[in-house]
Amino acid sequence: MIMTKQKNTLAERLNIGDEVRELKLGATFNPKNTSTAFHTIKYDFKPASVDTSRMASVDVGPNNQVTVIVPNSESSGVPHTVYKGNQREHAKECLMIYDKETGAITIEKLNHNIQVKKTRSEISSKSSHLPPQNAAIMQGQVPGQQISNGSGPSTNVASGHGPGSGAKLENSTMRITSKTKVSTGSRRNNIIDFKPRNSPMQQSSPSRPVAIHRSPQSAPAWDANNAQQTLPSIPMITDDDDFGLRAALHNGSQANTSGSSTGSAVGHSDYGSASSSSHMGKQRQAPHHGHAKRQQRSSPPMVQQQPNFGRNSYNGGNNYAQQQQHEQQRPSPYGHGNSMPMDLDSSRDHELTSKSVAHAAAVLEQQIGGALSASSSSSESDSSDSDSGSDSDDSTEDDRPSQQQQQHQHKAAQMHHQQQQQQQHHLQQQQQQQHFNQLPNLGLGSISPSYGNNHHQQQSRHHPHQQQQKQQSGIYASNGGFPNDLLQNDLQLSSNSSDEDDD
């Protein structure tokens, strides 16, 4: 295998010998030259179908825009390839031209450097008559408007468009840049009907569909004049949702009935009834702590009537009976077990107990009146006997048995008086016990023993204050007699006076 040496130097490629040759300056070095110019073209892609036997055309447009049309071979099916780009002036760069026939070498200045790229769009232009290309075009260098070979005649290159224009097609290698747009249809805005929420019960309903994607056009406009329309985030209690209001009224009625029952059963001063009602209110309101403010707002008129119940036991009983009738006439909001049981005959039972208490008080006053008359007669006899004994110092021994008999009678009267006081105290305790035992039968619920002990202690604490008020006011009992406290005070005074007489 014979290895051939590659020709690397320009002299070897041009077959130029070692002799010295003359270098000539071209017409571009003449400052008065306006007809000759040389340009260089650089393009990125050169298709294989370019016809090198024909001349290409260069068109310079505004703003240094250049269009280069290169003819293609007839077998390719596309007449030419179009390049577009811009031009830039050369600085201190020259072109050397070698003439093989004469061996002369000429140097010329380069005017512009044109850089173009293959276009991807179809362009219609006029066709031109392309003469045969010279050696410079075959080497890949496109000369300017005029090519000079030094001594021989110059050949003009057609840079314009000649006659015989026609439609020209583009190269088949041109890429298709049109993009296909897939229409997916317009976006549908599903308008969901918005209904104003009148109550939070509808908001928390599990069967109600939830609007996740809602168009802004479906949102209702806020109207300041419309009182029923509310914001979506603010629930409003209306006529449909009366659960909270009725529960508050129901709890308030329970507290009021408990306060009225304690006031009528105690039958003492305003302070005692107020303290007992407040104690009952605390016990009733302890499990319903969340509705305390609603109870206070919903039932202030009924609470204000509680201090008036303790002024008179019988008036308190009548007021309680009226309030029981009023509560019975009012329909219950709910039929389940949250409401307290109210007996229909509670007012009748209370009237019977009040009548029995009045009858027992009348019997006690009659017994106390008889005891007072006996004690007063015995005290008068004792005082007369003491006066007669002091006046007559000469009493005989026969009178001593009579004095002993009188003392014995006086002691018997005192014992009888003490027994009557014990019986009276026992009857009062029985009456109070009857009141406490009758309270559960009125349908107000059982009262705890702790409440009874505390209530009895409160009565015992405020008992002297109540006696002073009754003595100062002079209130009579319902049957026309004196109160029991005044009778007890008289009995104590009479017993003290009789004891002093015995001494």
Curated annotation (Swiss-Prot):
The keyword Phosphoprotein applies. The modification Phosphoserine is found at S199. Keywords: Activator, Developmental protein, Nucleus, Phosphoprotein, Transcription, Transcription regulation. Transmembrane segments: none annotated. Residues 143-223, 251-503 are annotated as: Disordered. GO terms for biological process: cellular response to heat; positive regulation of DNA-templated transcription; transcription elongation by RNA polymerase II. Promotes transcriptional elongation by Su(Tpl)/ELL. Essential for development. This is Ell-associated factor Eaf.
